[in-house]
Design a protein with these regions (language model features):
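Flexible, low-complexity linker and terminal segments
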Residues: 2-10, 132-338, 343, 356, ...
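Short helix-loop-beta junction
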Residues: 39-45, 243-253, 468-474
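Thiamine diphosphate
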Residues: 1-135, 226-227, 285-287, 292-506, 512, 516-517
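A glycine-rich helix N-cap at a beta->alpha junction
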Residues: 45-52, 93-104, 184-187, 426-439, ...
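Short acidic, glycine/serine/threonine-rich loops at helix termini
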Residues: 36-39, 62, 83-87, 109-116, ...
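Conserved thiamine diphosphate
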Residues: 106-155, 161, 196, 336, ...
Length: 579
């Protein structure tokens, strides 16, 4: 009897990769995709790695595929932008061993800077897309994706969303298959994409998509559920669950292959229902194609292009139900905030004091944009802080940049910050870059990277030394400082921003949540010395609260003894005690 387990969608994807016989997996962590690799590494049959960025991860998977084995890359939707260069080209080349890219979209922007739809990228790249609707399908579709990849000589994208990635469901486990490795044969016409070869491969790719679209009508992953024919829905992925919840008796065409679309199947389904609704999260990808075929349907006229969908959306827009209005629960506000003891808070308290603006980047330190720290002024994408600062200096001059810095984390610096810093040096820029080194990829759950000295598979390896790396670029002014030494940090910041050349400040202190961090002190208030000035409250540490009489309390269950509040108080109204 097969074993059944309750699995997250991401966990099921990892299981599907295992059962499909995958041998190589590469990724860069990014919510909501991170747990895929964290679960894949549990299977010793699969080599798994954290790559410096998604482009590298995609290329690692491509290399493994060309050599003849089944390989995959996984990333969040904005990571697909970084990986798009190799993705677009490998679509032309095709594969040898099966090749799958898992892309996790984020409707509702729970942890992302935009709400892009990976299906749009896939259409431009001419890469087929599968979209599972629950954990069981997440596992099964992974296996099916590798079969399709090898059958049609194409990379395949498996598209997930935050809700699927982080929802649980029953999954029937099966044994791992061990496909015979494909034999590699030298074939420059297929694998060397210079213009002459690429022109011929483009013709092949167009034919491949047409063939696949024709075959899609008979694919088992596209399912027709004929019930009441007054209402019909075409949907896919997690949105299917909302349709079944709101309209259990409606007819439904659930698409498992969401690009290319099975035109004949869609036309047949549409002809059998009175009113056809297209229910798809984010962009009107289905709707635009279906309407272009002359099929009457209703989509974004009543459904939004923004945010997550829900069963209530259907009840209101389709069934015209008056939903019961309920008062929102009265709960305390929980704005995003840096953790107690976070070294970034110490850095930002200094920048705030000096009235220095920061070009920001992607990571926990993005929270430096919100009050009371209010330091970060811009955030675009991974690695953009340094390039943005450089652009400001070239536009406004050296004097303008004296009260600006770029802030970037150690993992993000490894991701795409190095090229930006190199550009700054090469093009004779001026400006101060602060690398906030907390020895981890903190925002996505403490994954290792090239500068930590440990791989995803737990191997101890030489760590990239960020200080020496910056020096090797020809930067004369590279300084390391303890993030919590605010006196020294303030002195260094003043000194470096005044220089008419590139300088780098590396603030070093491990993330407070890292395993193995041991805290031997706590901070306690001394009320009789307090003059109620509020200096200790300025960094916004959640462990500190203001009492009715103006003195402060420190929650000992939250305090990590970092000492920032103590260092800010010049009157000795906060002390540290051993614990």
């Amino acid at each position: 009897m097969s074993e059944v387990k309750i699995m997250l969608g991401n966990e099921a994807i990892a299981r599907g990769a295992f059962e499909a016989g995958v041998k190589v997996s590469a990724a860069y962590p990014g919510t909501p995709s991170t747990e895929i690799s964290e679960n894949i590494v549990k299977y010793p049959e699969i080599y798994a790695e954290w790559s410096p960025n998604e482009k590298v991860a995609m290329e690692v998977a491509i290399g493994a595929s060309i050599s003849g084995v089944r390989a995959m890359a996984s990333m969040k939707h904005v990571g697909v932008n970084v990986a798009s260069d190799p993705l677009y080209t490998i679509s032309y080349s095709g594969v040898n061993g099966g090749l799958v890219l898992v892309a996790a979209d984020d409707p509702g922007l729970y942890s992302s800077q935009n709400e892009q739809d990976t299906r749009c990228v896939a259409r431009a790249a001419m890469v087929p897309v599968l979209e599972p609707s629950d954990s069981q399908e997440a596992k099964d579709f992974m296996k099916y994706a590798f079969d399709l990849s090898e059958k049609y000589d194409t990379p395949i994208i498996v598209r997930t969303t935050t809700r699927l990635s982080h929802s649980q469901g029953p999954v029937t486990l099966e044994e791992r298959c061990e496909p015979v490795d494909a034999v590699y044969e030298r074939n420059p016409a297929k694998y060397v994409m210079m213009p002459g070869n690429a022109k011929l491969r483009h013709v092949y790719v167009e034919k491949r998509l047409k063939d696949m679209a024709a075959d899609a009508c008979d694919m088992s992953i596209n399912k027709v559920e004929m019930n009441d024919t007054k209402i019909g829905f075409i949907t896919s992925g997690i949105a299917y669950q909302y349709v079944k919840e709101a309209c259990p008796n409606a007819s439904v065409l659930k698409l498992g292959l969401v690009h290319p679309l099975p035109r004949k199947l869609i036309e047949e389904f549409a002809s059998k229902v009175e009113t056809l609704y297209i229910f798809e999260e984010l962009e009107p990808v289905f709707e635009e194609q279906i309407k272009s075929w002359g099929i009457k349907c209703i989509g974004k006229e009543i459904f939004t292009v923004q945010g997550e969908y829900s069963a209530n959306m259907i009840r209101k827009a389709v069934l015209k139900e008056d939903l019961e209005l309920k008062a929102a629960a009265q709960v305390p506000a929980r704005p995003p905030i840096l953790c107690p003891g976070c070294p970034h808070r110490s850095v930002y308290s200094v920048l705030n004091k000096l009235k220095i603006h920061a070009a920001g980047d992607i990571g926990c330190y993005t929270l430096g944009a919100v009050a009371p720290l209010s330091v970060v002024d811009t955030t675009v994408c991974m690695g953009a802080s340094i390039s943005t600062l450089h652009g400001m200096e070239k536009a406004k001059g050296k004097d303008y940049i004296k009260n600006w810095v770029a802030v970037i984390g150690d993992s993000t610096f490894m991701h795409t910050g190095i090229n930006s810093l190199m550009n700054m040096v090469y093009n004779q820029g001026t400006g101060t870059v602060m690398i906030l080194d907390n020895s981890t990829t903190g925002m996505t759950g403490h994954q290792d990277h090239a500068a930590t000295g440990k791989t995803l598979m737990g191997e101890e390896v030489p760590a990239i030394n960020i200080f020496h790396l910056c020096k090797s670029l020809g930067i004369k002014n590279v300084v390391e400082v303890n993030a919590f030494d605010i006196v020294e940090l303030e002195r260094i910041v003043k000194e470096e921003v005044a220089k008419d050349e590139v300088s780098v400040i590396i603030t070093k202190s491990p993330c407070v949540l890292l395993k193995g961090n041991k805290f031997t002190t706590k901070c306690v208030p001394v009320p009789e010395k307090c003059v109620k000035c509020g200096m200790c409250l300025k960094p916004g540490c959640p462990a500190l609260t203001k009492n009715a009489d103006g003195t402060i309390s420190i929650d000992q269950t939250m305090c990590n003894g970092c000492g920032l509040c103590k260092n800010l108080c010049k009157l000795g109204a906060i002390e540290t005690v051993e614990v």
